[in-house]
Amino acid sequence: MRIICLLLAVTLVFSCKKNDQPGPNYNSDKSRLTQLTDSLMNVYNNSVEGNKPGDYSVGARGSLKAALDLAAQVESGKFTQEEVNNAYSNLALAGQQFSTKLIQEVSAQYLVGHWKFNGNAADSSGHGHNGALKTGYVGSSAATATDGGTLPQLTADRFGRANMAYSFGNGSLIQVPYASELNSPSFTISLWVDMTSNSNGSYMISMNRWWGYKFNLNGTAVPFLTVATAATIYDRDAGAVNVAAGVWTHLAASYTDGTMKFYVNGELKKTWTNTPGAAVTLASPVDLSIGNEMPKEFYNMTDNSNPAYFWGASYFVGSMDDIRMYNKVLTDAEVNSIYIIEKDL
């Protein structure tokens, strides 16, 4: 009898507690959630997926939209303050994750020259290293040197867009005034080339040839980088790599004290680790040359003991586009990112 009474008492207590509990409080403040939803919806509506700086990675918009849809359900429905707060936190996290999907320019703070060749030779890096179209020498010696009389010509780029790249030949070049940030102890060069024909002197980009640095193709179309240091001059190549004629190819090379690297279409092809010393700073500034070894006015045509002596024309024949110059060594991943960003529209 005592057990039955105890059970009845417990039942009554729990029954009373259950009946006394208030229902969920749906009188919640959704103002913060609404503000965040509106803000991120604006971001979503103005975002584009793609592979260029300023785009978002493919699939990123779908993830954000799913989070926005869930938040909208909470805004329009009956939910407690705790549930509203959770929805806010989840949406804020989705917004933060979405921001990490923004494709940014590779090492923008170290990009000291970017010649996109979009109708002109202007530098889009923000550093003002604009190029000028110039003619260059042709001829096999100083005695036979003549002005080629040809300027670089706007041509179609690798996507077939007219006037979005430059073709070079007959000594033509783009001349960029000397600047110390283009003459860095460590650097990376990135560019696209479509070689028409090749020779030992296919200079793609150069600052004072052997006495500064030069990036060219050798006689078998192997990428070749020459860098002068205080102690010596290093000539290194990309190894068993031959650039094909008539095909747009992405090339990159980097140099720092002790290491030189070569890349083709975003892939590391060769690493040299026997190049100690920083790249030299030129004692007498020489302008940067794209498409030829050196601008005409910097040659010495009479004294073959002079480092600036003209030994014969060395210039690129073909088209180039999207040339980048960094005053640091990019990582392998960064070079590959440039290739990914630039290989498609």
Predicted features, each with a name:
Residues 189-191, 247-255, 262:
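Short tryptophan-centered beta-strand motifs in secreted/extracellular beta-sheet-rich domains
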